């Protein structure tokens, strides 16, 4: 499981020209799954994100989590996080989990974040979306469950 976390002032998702979800500030999460991901992987990543201290304290040190600061989450499914560009000119997505599996894990992930008390807005799984993110910092962090559990 990979999550590209971006601290943001605001973020929104449009589908067919209509805004379907938006947040006024917090975290935008681009979320992708691979074949080996499980419910345990989702639980691990949700807990990691919930406690991640990516907001500055009064000393301008990243020492405050979203739970402590307040704010919302915009979670967007992003199978292209598992693109393989090692050969040729066109990305391969064979490392991405099949849609049905990924959708179930994506929904579980969002539910875990919501159950932790966060306002969670989402994109539409599998849809072509226009995602607008106004970064704060910018702070952009890639979380990869396979790398983090080594």
From Swiss-Prot:
Coarse class of the protein's main subcellular location: cytoplasm
Domain of life per record: Bacteria
One CC-aspect GO term: cytoplasm
SUPFAM superfamilies named in the record: DTD-like
Broad EC category: hydrolase
InterPro entries: Daa-tRNA_deacyls_DTD, DTD-like_sf
Keyword list, A-Z: Cytoplasm, Hydrolase, RNA-binding, tRNA-binding
Signal peptide start and end residues: none
One GO BP annotation of this record: D-amino acid catabolic process
Keyword match Hydrolase: yes
Catalytic activity field: glycyl-tRNA(Ala) + H2O = tRNA(Ala) + glycine + H(+); a D-aminoacyl-tRNA + H2O = a tRNA + a D-alpha-amino acid + H(+)
Assigned EC number: 3.1.1.96
Location of the motif Gly-cisPro motif, important for rejection of L-amino acids: 137-138
Plastid as UniProt keyword: no
Compartments where located: Cytoplasm
Coiled coil: none
Functional note: An aminoacyl-tRNA editing enzyme that deacylates mischarged D-aminoacyl-tRNAs. Also deacylates mischarged glycyl-tRNA(Ala), protecting cells against glycine mischarging by AlaRS. Acts via tRNA-based rather than protein-based catalysis; rejects L-amino acids rather than detecting D-amino acids in the active site. By recycling D-aminoacyl-tRNA to D-amino acids and free tRNA molecules, this enzyme counteracts the toxicity associated with the formation of D-aminoacyl-tRNA entities in vivo and helps enforce protein L-homochirality.
Matches recorded under HAMAP family: Deacylase_Dtd
Similarity comment: family membership: Belongs to the DTD family.
Free-text domain note: A Gly-cisPro motif from one monomer fits into the active site of the other monomer to allow specific chiral rejection of L-amino acids.
Subunit structure as annotated in this protein's UniProt entry: Homodimer.
Listed name of the protein: D-aminoacyl-tRNA deacylase
Organism expressing this protein natively: Listeria innocua serovar 6a (strain ATCC BAA-680 / CLIP 11262)
Gene name in the database record: dtd
């Amino acid at each position: 499981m990979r999550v590209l976390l971006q601290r943001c002032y605001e973020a929104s998702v449009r589908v067919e020209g209509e805004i379907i979800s938006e947040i006024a500030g917090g975290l935008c999460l681009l979320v992708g799954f691979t074949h080996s991901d499980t419910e345990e992987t989702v639980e691990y990543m949700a807990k990691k994100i919930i406690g991640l201290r990516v907001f500055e304290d009064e000393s301008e040190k990243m020492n405050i989590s979203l739970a402590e600061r307040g704010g919302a989450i915009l979670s967007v499914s992003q199978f292209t996080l598992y693109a393989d560009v090692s050969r040729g000119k066109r990305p391969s997505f064979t490392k991405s989990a099949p849609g049905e599996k990924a959708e179930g894990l994506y929904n579980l992930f969002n539910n875990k974040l919501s159950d932790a008390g966060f306002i969670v807005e989402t994109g539409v799984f599998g849809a072509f979306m226009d995602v607008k993110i106004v970064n704060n910092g910018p702070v952009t962090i890639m979380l990869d469950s396979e790398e983090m559990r080594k």
